[in-house]
Regions:
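Intrinsic disorder/low-complexity detector
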Residues: 1, 80, 205-206, 213, ...
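C-terminal motif of bacterial Sec signal peptides marking the signal peptidase cleavage site
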Residues: 3-6
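Core segments of small alpha/beta cavity-forming domains
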Residues: 9-67, 71, 182-250
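Intrinsic-disorder/low-complexity regions
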Residues: 10, 163-165, 259
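Surface-exposed, charged secondary-structure patches
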Residues: 55-142, 234-271
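Short beta-strand edge/turn micro-motifs at domain boundaries
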Residues: 105-191
């Protein structure tokens, strides 16, 4: 259903055609159109290293937009100013759930990366742009995310040189990019994406997966876990195995104040 109000039918038909042509390309998973409206740099502006558009990165956008759809709700065209505004209802992937899963997976990867090396340099432990997109690709490939709806406004301008030739173009903006990806940019940049309880849960669950060397590096007891002494290695391996078999936890409460949180947690481990 398309509601058209305000000006001549011809003008609105032209504007409607531009919107339809552009957004249909997104629906058809056109990679050039995807990059025109959603720059791969915008999702992760703080990434440590830029990348060329590999097939894996392009696949992320194909997976993201595979269920994309839209509906034009209203059009308003100002012929004198050569401006137009369209109200749209977008159907996108549940970006909030995707961002939450990404936050948890990214935190787990960061913990394991720190545990894989004795060096704690921030630059070495920060994911590159490619690593972040590969993680998104993994999540989109392995999970089925619901589709959600959101309404947004799209602005257009007429670049035509005279009255005989209309050249309507959609004005690209950060807001439009964010809406087309269901608000994913906003969710990923949210420092409170994971609650304190969720952050602690990821941390403690990740400890359960660490091998002997990782645990030694991460807990700062390399001298016990990383040694050439066969007997010490056997003891360290036995301790890690015992830890894995007995470790458990239960979060009972969380008190937050500003940027700090105190979490009451019952931890079970070996004696």
């Amino acid at each position: 259903v398309i509601c058209l109000t305000g000006c001549s039918h011809v003008d609105k038909t032209d504007v409607q055609a531009v919107i339809t042509n552009e957004l249909d390309l997104l629906k058809n998973l056109d990679s050039d159109t995807t990059q025109k409206y959603v720059s791969y740099k915008e999702l992760f502006p703080d990434a440590t290293k830029e990348i060329k558009l590999s097939n894996e990165v392009k696949e992320v956008f194909s997976l993201f937009f595979q269920d994309f759809d839209y509906q034009i709700l209203d059009l308003d065209v100002d012929e004198d100013k050569k401006e137009a505004t369209a109200s749209l209802r977008l159907s996108t992937i549940d970006a909030a759930s995707l961002a939450k899963d990404y936050g948890e997976a990214s935190l787990k990867n960061a913990i394991l990366k720190a545990a894989d090396s004795e060096e704690q340099a921030t630059e070495k432990n920060t994911d590159s742009m490619e690593e972040r997109y590969l993680l998104l690709d993994q999540l989109l490939s392995n999970n089925n995310y619901a589709t959600v709806e959101r309404e947004c406004t799209v602005e257009l301008c007429n670049k035509g040189s005279n009255d005989d030739k209309d050249e309507w173009e959609i004005i690209r903006s950060h807001s439009l990019e964010n809406n087309l990806v269901g608000g994913l940019m906003t969710y990923l940049s949210d420092n409170n994406l994971l609650s304190p309880e969720e952050t602690l849960t990821v941390y403690l669950n990740t400890l359960k997966t660490m091998n002997t060397e990782q645990m030694g590096n991460y807990l700062g007891i390399e001298s016990l876990f990383n040694t050439s002494d066969t007997d010490k290695n056997s003891i360290a391996a036995a301790l890690v195995e015992l830890f894995h078999s007995t470790f458990d936890f239960n979060i009972s409460s969380c008190d937050e104040e500003s940027y700090n949180a105190v979490i009451q947690t019952k931890i079970t481990t070996f004696d």
